[in-house]
């Protein structure tokens, strides 16, 4: 069968790599059209950019500048004791041609953390499936990218992406480590200590990355620790949970966090609870669309195979609805935190990580549901498997059609009034073909040349017109206000103004 046929598994992984590669290529070509930083990229990287301009690649000075940036924002704006350091290394400080590394900085952690999760789960349930973790990681990465509600903030903008996704990715990896430690009695002593230590490190990094990812990490570890402590007398998740709580508190109680939250009109507790509950429910309805159903269909056979593992007892599958309930609570909590502190969920990049939590939670729910059907209700699904086996020649075509559907439709975006648009690789290819990505790049290059002109200490830039604002790549243009004026110190100007601003 497929599950014990290495050649068939290799062919399946190759097909997924081919489809993912073509989609990523369209994204990358579209991304190469945008070669300039934007918005908060300038603010966080002003010190490191100045070091590169004056001293070149002087690593000690760069590290010191990044650390100074980190400390400044920890004390004056946000309690992100890791993220400020990371954001200071915005790739364009070495030259705008390197800004495209953003896509790599986002995709690599996401893919390998998904692989880590899949490996921890799959090899515990069926050690013979060495290639299945790779296939699952490729499929999930593809699905998460194509369905991302705000791709410009999650893939194309360094500050927007790197302030959220790497820490969410680490939370995903931490969930895999927590699952592996649920079976600590079957692990060698060294591996148990390694997993526990890795969980602590990941938790501390997540806590210094973003508060919403930190809260997600705490809740997942709390659930795992509670289940293992009650049912197995297993406390190996407790160190990572303690580190996660310490990291989140260090973030929330930072002086900079107090400064930031004071600038927002936060909602009352009860109001935030109700509003976040309603928004979480609305997102469930909004995101249950055809591409997501395609993903769940593609996951049926591998998940069904894993539910038959003798490692898990039947009682694990008694209440499959708990998977959906836990997913909803996690989404609710992730939306509640910014709603309570800032009065709303804010930018679409935050919805990106809520969307990813939703997708992974539904995959876990599907796993529990399949196990419940076979192992609790006694419904045999072998007949359906045999039918699929008889249709083995047609299944690759069906899978390709589903992947194509995910690549062409994706998920709804969060841009107001533009629900008819879908943020997929198809849209990226379209913007390349009609020249809108090129016009956007040319306009930014012209603006960059003006800002880099040492003969002009005072610069006036014009807003982008409608033809220079491609739907997929464009987020917002520069505007008066403190959030936008990292331009002045970044380029060493006396002043930067906007002409004809409306």
Question: Model-flagged regions — what are they?
Answer:
Residues 194-196, 245, 318-324, 372-418:
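Signature aromatic-anchored transmembrane alpha helix within multi-pass, membrane-resident enzymes
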Residues 400-480:
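Membrane-embedded, lumen/periplasm-facing catalytic core of multi-pass transferases
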Residues 1-27:
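Start-transfer (signal-anchor) and selected internal transmembrane alpha helices
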Residues 32-101, 158-161, 203, 207-350, ...:
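Transmembrane catalytic cores of multi-pass membrane glycosyltransferases
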């Amino acid at each position: 069968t497929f599950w014990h046929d290495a050649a068939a598994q290799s062919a399946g992984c190759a097909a997924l790599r081919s489809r993912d590669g073509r989609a990523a290529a369209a994204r990358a070509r579209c991304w190469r059209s945008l070669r300039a930083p934007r918005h908060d990229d300038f603010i966080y990287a002003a010190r490191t950019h100045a070091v590169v301009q004056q001293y070149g690649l002087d690593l000690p000075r760069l590290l010191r500048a990044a650390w100074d940036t980190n400390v400044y924002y920890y004390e004056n704006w946000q309690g992100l004791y890791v993220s400020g350091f990371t954001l200071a290394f915005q790739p364009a400080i070495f030259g705008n041609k390197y800004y495209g590394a953003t896509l790599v900085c986002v995709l690599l952690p996401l893919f390998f953390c998904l692989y880590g999760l899949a490996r921890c789960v799959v090899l515990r349930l069926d050690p013979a499936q060495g290639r299945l973790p790779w296939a699952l990681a490729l499929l999930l990465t593809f699905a998460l990218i194509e369905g991302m509600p705000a791709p410009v903030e999650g893939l194309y903008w360094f500050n927007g992406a790197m302030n959220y996704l790497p820490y969410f990715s680490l939370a995903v990896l931490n969930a895999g480590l927590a699952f592996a430690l649920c079976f600590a009695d079957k692990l060698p002593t060294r591996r148990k200590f390694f997993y526990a230590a890795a969980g602590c490190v990941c938790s501390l990094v997540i806590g210094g990355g973003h508060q919403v990812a930190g809260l997600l990490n705490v809740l997942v570890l709390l659930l795992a620790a509670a289940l293992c402590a009650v049912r197995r007398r297993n406390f190996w998740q407790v160190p990572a949970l303690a580190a996660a709580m310490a990291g989140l508190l260090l973030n929330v109680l930072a002086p900079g966090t107090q400064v930031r939250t004071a600038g927002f009109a936060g909602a009352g507790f009860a109001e935030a609870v109700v509003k976040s509950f309603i928004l979480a429910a609305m997102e469930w309805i909004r995101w249950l669309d055809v591409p997501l159903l395609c993903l769940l269909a593609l996951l049926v056979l591998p998940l069904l195979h894993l539910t038959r593992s003798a490692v898990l007892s039947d009682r694990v599958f008694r209440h499959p609805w708990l998977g959906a309930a836990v997913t909803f609570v996690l989404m609710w909590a992730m939306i509640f935190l910014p709603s309570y502190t800032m009065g709303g969920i804010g930018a679409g990049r935050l919805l990106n990580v809520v969307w990813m939590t939703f997708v992974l939670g539904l995959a876990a729910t599907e796993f529990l549901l399949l196990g419940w059907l076979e192992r609790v209700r006694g419904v045999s699904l072998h007949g359906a498997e045999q039918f699929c086996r008889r249709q083995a020649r047609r299944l690759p075509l069906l899978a390709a059609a589903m992947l194509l559907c995910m690549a062409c439709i994706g998920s709804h975006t969060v841009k107001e009034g533009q629900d008819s648009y879908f943020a997929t690789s198809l849209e990226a290819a379209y913007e390349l073909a009609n020249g809108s990505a090129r016009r956007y790049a040319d306009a930014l290059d012209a603006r960059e040349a003006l800002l880099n002109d040492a003969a002009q200490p005072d610069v006036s830039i014009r807003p982008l017109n409608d033809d220079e604002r491609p739907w997929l790549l464009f987020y917002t243009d520069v505007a008066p206000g403190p959030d936008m004026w990292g331009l002045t110190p970044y380029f060493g100007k006396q002043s930067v103004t906007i002409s004809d601003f409306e």
